């Protein structure tokens, strides 16, 4: 057995009718975790419903419906393999909570795949001022997804079909607007594809002999290829932050008979081992980790990306809750935030936002009301340069530096140091009205929290 392939996460973005589902469905279908039986079942159903022409997207719709009904479907279905990577699609838009998921998402995307439709009029609709394409690309960039691939889809429906001038026109247009957002077009692969017919998806298409391939240039070196799957192979692998201090936001806390209290969550940075003396912020409870397990197997060490349960001594289920963050008491432990400063981008708020506005913030697994105490300045979204100091209010489309005060204890970090704990969604009226990236945190001084006997004992024993 060779070494296991590296895992990477991608997010697929683009306008509603760009063919994201068909393209994604095609990759999952051809290279993915869906077994033949399931595919045949889906095909038969699609045929019976007269949706034969829709099979790839249909596969995805079936998966989406199950995902939305909260059925924990076999996540393997959202995975596919390239020659180099195991790729997981962490979310595809169209899902109601896409924006929120992308921010609080259980994982950071390593790369965004932007699908644009090449059909006459379709591309223009997706990219128009109110099209979703811009918003998704802006979000991806703001949230730290620095790699981008562009699939120019539906090449079979250009005038004439598979038109080179149309591809070049779209490439030029998209390059100019992703550049405005902050991406470097020279580092972006542009691939003309048909997600439906499969052109340039896995191998070079005979229908576009004019396409000599895509090239990218970046400081890590050059890459080139012909197909979309090769572009995915050229993604730079992420550095998983094992060397940083431990941060593990809790998703749930269970009481398990005969074992005790078991918090569950995903290691975002650092490592967690049995014997670690952890502190839970913002409650400031310190205790010893007895054991760590993943998928019912004991682990000697959990690393970033691992979803684990760990057993803690002398702490009751009532003392811990979702949204708390575990860290190592001896290595830059997490603390509660008194207040914090963030760059906020307003996406869709019907009115004006001014000082005193108190929506709910979703940051990692925490869900807490925070007050916009002071809108310090309006800034240019791309450069971050100040355009107005102490504005009266901000509205949709604006970016601003804001000071926020949580209404209850909350543990957050700067995006610079701990990205997953430094980005948030602002929720109001059942939608995401803004997104933010935390610049600086004013921590509360940790005062007299609970230190369990287990922690004291373990600490004494180690002296």
Swiss-Prot record:
GO cellular component: cytoplasm
Region (G3), start-end ranges: 91-94
Region of interest (G4), ranges: 153-156
Domain tr-type G, first and last residues per copy: 5-242
Xref: CDD domains: EF1_alpha (cd01883), EF1_alpha_II (cd03693), EF1_alpha_III (cd03705)
Pfam families assigned to the protein according to its UniProt record, in alphabetical order: GTP-eEF1A_C (PF22594), GTP_EFTU (PF00009), GTP_EFTU_D2 (PF03144)
Region: G1, residue numbers: 14-21
Membership in a protein family: Belongs to the TRAFAC class translation factor GTPase superfamily. Classic translation factor GTPase family. EF-Tu/EF-1A subfamily.
Function: This protein promotes the GTP-dependent binding of aminoacyl-tRNA to the A-site of ribosomes during protein biosynthesis.
Protein name: Elongation factor 1-alpha
Species assigned in the record: Bombyx mori
